[in-house]
């Protein structure tokens, strides 16, 4: 910090903002072990599953794929009232920062320092969404290619033949 002081008119406030930015960048680049992430996701799911608006709740992303380390925790929920579900998610205990809160998505940072993302989908989309948000990106691309060759379209909303939905439930 002291090296920057006075250099090109950089003052204390600017230095403080630069340090905050570097800290945030380092935090966002950190990955945590699955051994640390699993108890966290288990605790969050235990807390949220008592919400009567939630029909199903599962971990997704790299945690569900059992990767050795995860960059964030992804949770998928099925329920009809997305806004209310997201509101209960961002207000749960242990949240230190709300990063986003919308009708179908919420993102928070929790006291363990990890980012947790929640996505709410309809019950009839849950299976397709769980597959899609579990990934990996490469797997999803490969799956879409196989589906295309069979005259199907696969997305987070379901499996379609033309405009007709032919799958998506879990």
Regions found by a protein language model. Name each.
Residues 1-58:
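Helical scaffold of the NTase/Pol beta-like nucleotidyltransferase catalytic core
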Residues 11, 61, 147:
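Divalent metal-coordination and catalytic microenvironments
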Residues 12, 51, 67-70, 112, ...:
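Short flexible coil/turn linkers enriched for glycine and charged/polar residues
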Residues 20-22, 77-79, 120-122:
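Flexible glycine-/small-residue-rich
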Residues 33-41, 82-86, 140:
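Generic alpha-helical secondary structure
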Residues 42-83:
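Active-site nucleotide-donor binding segment shared across nucleotidyl transfer reactions
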Residues 83, 87-170:
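Acidic, metal-coordinating catalytic segment for phosphate/diphosphate chemistry
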């Amino acid at each position: 910090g002291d090296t920057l002081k006075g250099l090109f008119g950089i003052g204390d406030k600017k230095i403080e903002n630069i340090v905050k930015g570097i800290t945030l960048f380092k935090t966002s680049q950190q990955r945590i072990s699955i051994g640390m992430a699993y108890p966290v996701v288990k605790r969050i799911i235990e807390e949220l599953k008592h919400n009567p608006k939630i029909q199903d709740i599962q971990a997704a992303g790299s945690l569900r794929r059992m990767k050795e380390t995860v960059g964030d925790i992804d949770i998928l929920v099925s329920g009809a009232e997305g806004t209310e579900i997201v509101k209960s998610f961002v207000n749960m205990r242990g949240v230190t920062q709300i990063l986003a809160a919308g009708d179908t998505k919420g993102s928070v940072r929790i006291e363990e320092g990890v980012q947790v993302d929640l996505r709410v989908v309809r019950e009839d989309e849950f299976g397709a969404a769980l597959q899609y948000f579990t990934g990996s990106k490469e797997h999803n691309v490969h799956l879409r290619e196989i589906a295309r060759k069979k005259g199907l379209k696969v997305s987070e909303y379901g499996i379609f033949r033309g405009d007709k939905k032919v799958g998506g439930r879990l």
